[in-house]
Amino acid sequence: MNTVELIKILLEYKPSDILRKRKEELVELIPEFKACFNFDQKSKWHTYDVFEHILHVVDNVDNTPVLRIAALFHDVAKPIVYEEDRFGVGHFPNHWTKSAEIFSEFAIKNNLDNELIEKVNKLIMFHDLNFGRLTEEEKKAIVEALSEEEIELLFKFKKADLLAQNEEYYYLLDDYQKQKENILSKYERSSNEKYHIWFRWSNPIRKS
């Protein structure tokens, strides 16, 4: 398996069937995946091991290169950063950062498109972000970091990720919709503020 073939597989209707059968070839291309096989996440959020969870997310997202590649890499670093607390519960601190690093190394080595690399990295870096807990300042930072199109992609990705987890938490899908609407409203407000600033500048109050 080479990079071109991998991307072709990712754009199939159900890539998981092929990737499951050819997982050893996937490891030859991206060695970090080997540790994901049968890796028990020991978390109430998850019913699948890391690799199976990744495959389900890959199937769940729309078959575009950005979403499918982001899905493949988004949790690849989980076994690397894994920590277990005294209750035997698994945690994966900053796995998004390490996963983005692994993707970036792969992407640069294989000369992937710069725009694609940037979009995939953003999805990986923000996929686990709890938008419901963000302060107004943090929401403002998100608006500056991501375009409206990228927010739409991110929430598609987050929904696909949730649907590959424990069914008990599917109720959060409604929360995701509200969170998306809330963050998108910040773009409208930001645009309106910019418009009013421009209007005042371009249409100064004339003296009588």
Question: What positions do the PLM features span?
Answer:
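Short, charged low-complexity intrinsically disordered segments located at boundaries
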Residues: 1, 34-38, 51, 86-87, ...
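Acidic/His-rich, divalent-metal-binding segments that scaffold phosphate/diphosphate chemistry
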Residues: 1-85
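Generic detector of well-ordered alpha-helical segments enriched in charged/polar residues
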Residues: 4-11, 16-23, 27-30, 34, ...
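Charged substrate- and nucleic-acid-binding regions of tRNA-handling and nucleotidyl-transfer enzymes
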Residues: 1, 6, 150-208
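A broadly tuned preference for mixed-charge, low-complexity surface segments
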Residues: 18, 24-27, 73-75, 81-82, ...
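Divalent metal-dependent catalytic cores for phosphoryl transfer on phosphate-bearing substrates
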Residues: 59-167
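Short, isolated positions within intrinsically disordered regulatory regions of eukaryotic proteins
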Residues: 49, 100, 202-205
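A residue-identity detector for tryptophan
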Residues: 45, 96, 198-201
